[in-house]
Amino acid sequence: MGSEMCIRDRGYTFIHPFNDEDVIAGQGTIGLEILDQIPDVDVVIVPIGGGGLISGVAFAIKELNPNVKVYGVQATGAPSMLKSIDDGKIEKLDSVSTIADGIAVKEPGDITFAMCQKYVDGIVTVSDDEIAAAILALIEQQKLITEGAGAVSVAAAMFNKVDVKGKKVCCLLSGGNIDVTILSRVIKRGLLKSGRTYSLTIELLDKPGQLKGVADIIAKEGGNVISIHHERASEGSDINGCYLRIVLETKNFDHIAQIKKALTDAGFIIKSY
């Protein structure tokens, strides 16, 4: 209602963020740059919210080189364009929920819907955990900070949502507008998703030396303890037992399995995985 009042009372002009031919044409210049800088590109992966970005990029690329595959990526919690394409008509979602708030769009536009139908080779979705892992990978490997929406293209490639093996691929990173508190949470989720941190609960006998025994095994296997909580008289524990809740810094999922095996081989009971 606010925008309508500004148009009526102040003479402002409303520019739609994605369902506008001029906006789409502007986005299309990115497609031209991709072909100019990577003329032998095989696959281009683009984030999709309302569809303006991919409409312009796909139009420019397909008109100049129809052999290039253009794929769109949406968040699992906001798949409005995918649902619309699958149903053959524009669909409006009741709600959206994703850390990729820049592409959390309930309903695509009629212009962008038609262009995606014509020019986009396929649309896939990625989960919030996969997005978080992609953000972390970009920070560590490329020294780039992206928002959730900006990282979905990399997430699609990382988690094999698009066939990229043996191909020259361009992942379009569409933005870096991420709050530092959200970034902190995303990094933690990314570490969990990539097997870089792990939480477990171990049931111990309540006697001296048990905690040291666990710590020695973890250290021997190359794990690092981030936090530890020793809990007596916990609900569900034996009267002579206690729970040890540990958060570990690990290398990968194989390393986690190695530590867990060493603990169970030593007689410790892991209660949660």
Task: Pin down the residues of each PLM region.
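Gly-rich Lys/Arg/Thr-decorated short loops/hinges at beta-loop-alpha junctions or inter-strand turns
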Residues: 10-14, 96, 195, 240-242
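Short, ordered loop/turn segments at secondary-structure junctions
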Residues: 19-20, 75-76, 128, 151, ...
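Active-site-adjacent helical/loop segments in soluble small-molecule enzymes
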Residues: 109-167
